[in-house]
Amino acid sequence: MLSKLLRLGEGRMVKRLKKVADYVGTLSDDVEKLTDAELRAKTDEFKRRLADQKNPETLDDLLPEAFAVAREAAWRVLDQRPFDVQVMGAAALHLGNVAEMKTGEGKTLTCVLPAYLNALAGNGVHIVTVNDYLAKRDSEWMGRVHRFLGLQVGVILATMTPDERRVAYNADITYGTNNEFGFDYLRDNMAHSLDDLVQRGHHYAIVDEVDSILIDEARTPLIISGPADGASNWYTEFARLAPLMEKDVHYEVDLRKRTVGVHEKGVEFVEDQLGIDNLYEAANSPLVSYLNNALKAKELFSRDKDYIVRDGEVLIVDEFTGRVLIGRRYNEGMHQAIEAKEHVEIKAENQTLATITLQNYFRLYDKLAGMTGTAQTEAAELHEIYKLGVVSIPTNMPMIREDQSDLIYKTEEAKYIAVVDDVAERYAKGQPVLIGTTSVERSEYLSRQFTKRRIPHNVLNAKYHEQEATIIAVAGRRGGVTVATNMAGRGTDIVLGGNVDFLTDQRLRERGLDPVETPEEYEAAWHSELPIVKEEASKEAKEVIEAGGLYVLGTERHESRRIDNQLRGRSGRQGDPGESRFYLSLGDELMRRFNGAALETLLTRLNLPDDVPIEAKMVTRAIKSAQTQVEQQNFEVRKNVLKYDEVMNQQRKVIYAERRRILEGENLKDQALDMVRDVITAYVDGATGEGYAEDWDLDALWTALKTLYPVGITADSLTRKDHEFERDDLTREELLEALLKDAERAYAAREAELEEIAGEGAMRQLERNVLLNVIDRKWREHLYEMDYLKEGIGLRAMAQRDPLVEYQREGYDMFMAMLDGMKEESVGFLFNVTVEAVPAPPVAPAAEPAELAEFAAAAAAAAQQRSAVDGGARERAPSALRAKGVASESPALTYSGPAEDGSAQVQRNGGGAHKTPAGVPAGASRRERREAARRQGRGAKPPKSVKKR
């Protein structure tokens, strides 16, 4: 319903865009008369008109002229003139919409116009692609147009240094992947100097394949992590146990929810294997996460589908695009469990240093736009989360592709036999075929079948993605057979007869020419070589059209309709003929997860042979229903991720804003002194409370204060008069005033001391280093504790409480406690850290000086003393300035190596025998003791693992 409501004004928007395109067209004659130099000079003219103080123009005012200039430049440089529908798409992008343009309609060229227009403002434009190859290709290819018009173009690649990134971001237009933009944002907020920053703001972004990045990728947060302690031997031990456990006997699996649940027999089996009495006892509870991960690795993560193993390393495969996600790792120990399952090196677990979801990263931009061939199915989500409207841009030529109905077979074997027969028939008549699969395993199986039938073919999957552009560029040639995993975001059009631009570029590169390194020679050779390639490709394209155009064959329905539509959309581009069909079986994952039993019953009643397919509306409805259910589930997951991350997002904004103030502040003395006052005020409040002066324990207060700074006054000097106690005369305000003056005196003395040791400005440098180190360390600890809070917050629903509300409330309390802890530790470090006048290496973002660590230990010890100052009130109210942590209640577990029978032995550091829960007889059974432990809620904090970057 919401999608329909959102489309009500679409017709008016399309008419508005059509008027813009028509007006741009009326300017073409005047622009065509300009020389190259005059056309290039238009850029400076536009910039002057924007900056005019008396009569400034807006980007909207310049749109028609700027679009006309960019359109003419594209024609002169690329021999490609954007069609009117592309100008309409460009206008939609400038207005901050998602332009839905079918495959082959020229989204890459469309992007040139709004990028040029918005770059005139001088704030930078980010063009976001799905991989490094497309970012580099588009920056070179479309960058030729921008450079012709006098703009600078940069590209962000994974291998670049910070200096190279900074140069790229300072360009007028910057290409890069969503991951690189996001990680650079996180790294900038871990920098210890303004000189280390690379980005310069978030003003305007155009996201290519916007549905893939903003929808599919939204469930996966970007995480920068560092090493953490972990017990890799437990992963190995549970990888040994998992194959010994039987499904539906020891555990159950829910494929729809992608969860596993351990039965009572499974728990007893594990306890017997490990030689422990109670798996759910506090000391053993970390083992539960190892068990769950091992079972998930066994049942829910398949090799050559969800991941591949290359050179002894487990690499994740993107379920939507089929690409390898280099540098990505599953979190919560899942990646280590898979490594143990595959018997490869188990890499250390990691701790989160910085994180953000793509949803919240892209909401940083002042203006956001996107392009894709399939957006209407996700229009409601794009509007709800990103406030983006979706505009369907008409095709330049009518679509004449024939989409055949699905064929459903009883078995996978029968389905693949039919697929190979169909492809062989098409190959024989010279028709190019694109076969879409959902996994690496399936693509390689089909490849073997084609080899047996002696059908030449190319395979494009996660193992061969480096050859992606070459394979796709020739996939439309006569007799071409291409087996590929999911085609989402491939970026290179399948052109009948071959991709002319790609083939021309390939020939020029073979001659040693490069559009960036040798631009003049490249441009000259391009214009001479292009007509030759065009003629060759045109002749072959006619033969392909006579054979029926590109035939797209899907071997399985994806859980997302968009992915199916994107696969189909590879055929029938620009009015070309084409055909598509999906071959399905009851063994397909989607069919098994939803309504598979009903379909199997239908086929059984029809009594059809395995090799005879059916075509029925019931099947089509069942598939659509299944896909809709999955899409709705995924939408709910993404909304839930966003709701919880919104809590962290507000906290992240506060911390990052504070870091930036520290980085930019030339003199942090006032801020440091404010912290000193806040900390001492909190200490005094905790010591005085609401009682009378004679009830105050000033000795405990002084003991606590001495852990922070060298106190120069004594309690006696305030409370004694003529050697007699006069506590009734001392007020809380007098006590606080005296201590604040003393602290300011001590701070001035500390500054003089440092200047004598290290010269002028030493205290200012120490302030910056201390504040940055403390804020980074406390934020890192806070991320860990917030993750831990979120892991168990769902259990609050059992107490009739809203988990999200509880997460918001407790997260706020923890955040405020962290801010108080930052102040307290910063003050202690400023007064106590040792400073020497020797050159020091740059401080790494996650590093912490040894002196700070030593003081942190001392401060922790002093915290216990301070808790007695107010008779334990600090334990009840977290308003005092100290960090609030979530500590494990159980001894640490270590791995002592396997016993003679190969089982793992549990040792407890400093622990003894298992303790029987209170209220349980000594002779109680294992099950009774375990249930008692569960009821008492005795649980320990499980080991934490995060994604690695």
Swiss-Prot record:
The keyword Lipoprotein does not apply. Coiled coil: none annotated. GO terms for molecular function: ATP binding; ATP hydrolysis activity; protein-exporting ATPase activity. ATP binds at residues 86, 104-108, 493. It is found in: Cell membrane; Cytoplasm. CDD domains: DEXDc_SecA, SF2_C_secA. Its main location: membrane. Residues 869-949 are annotated as: Disordered. Keywords: ATP-binding, Cell membrane, Cytoplasm, Membrane, Nucleotide-binding, Protein transport, Translocase, Translocation, Transport. The keyword Cell membrane applies. It is an enzyme of class 7 (translocase). InterPro entries: Helicase_ATP-bd (IPR014001), Helicase_C-like (IPR001650), P-loop_NTPase (IPR027417), SecA (IPR000185), SecA_CS (IPR020937), SecA_DEAD (IPR011115), SecA_motor_DEAD (IPR014018), SecA_preprotein_X-link_dom (IPR011130). It comes from the Bacteria. GO terms for biological process: intracellular protein transmembrane transport; protein import; protein targeting; protein transport by the Sec complex. Part of the Sec protein translocase complex. Interacts with the SecYEG preprotein conducting channel. Has a central role in coupling the hydrolysis of ATP to the transfer of proteins into and across the cell membrane, serving as an ATP-driven molecular motor driving the stepwise translocation of polypeptide chains across the membrane. Part of the essential Sec protein translocation apparatus which comprises SecA, SecYEG and auxiliary proteins SecDF. Other proteins may also be involved. Monomer and homodimer. NCBIfam families: PRK12904.1 (NF009538), secA (TIGR00963). This is Protein translocase subunit SecA 1. It comes from Mycobacterium tuberculosis (strain ATCC 25618 / H37Rv).
